[in-house]
């Protein structure tokens, strides 16, 4: 996200975002969901340690969030995402917004000086 989001204050059911949008590497992201909703949902993939037990009649899924984590976890990406989140929290969204506004103004002012560009 490019701004702070209080999922509890907004009573958000689901929130997803890409890690690379907040300086983490590509290939990692976040899905926030209310636990009660995740507990009602079946997984859409199978694999890894998402299955608690298997019998001849079916399978018992692991507890949330593990039942949605099929396959090998991107450990390096998860670590990098956590560090990116800490970095953004450290510098603050206000700093990011101010910097983006300054860069946008600089770009727009520069583009206005190019005769072939009309804004």
Where does each model-flagged region fall?
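Pyridoxal 5′-phosphate
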Residues: 1-119
């Amino acid at each position: 996200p490019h701004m702070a989001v209080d999922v509890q204050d907004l009573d958000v059911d689901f929130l997803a975002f890409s890690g690379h949008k907040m300086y983490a590497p590509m290939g990692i992201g976040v899905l926030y969901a209310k636990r009660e909703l995740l507990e009602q949902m079946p997984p859409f993939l199978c694999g890894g340690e998402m299955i608690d037990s298997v019998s001849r009649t079916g399978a018992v899924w692991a507890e949330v969030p593990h039942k949605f984590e099929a396959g090998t976890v991107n450990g390096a990406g998860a670590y990098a995402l956590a560090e990116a989140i800490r970095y953004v929290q450290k510098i603050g969204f206000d700093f990011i917004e101010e910097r983006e506004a300054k860069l946008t103004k600089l770009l727009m002012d520069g583009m206005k000086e190019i005769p072939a560009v009309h804004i």
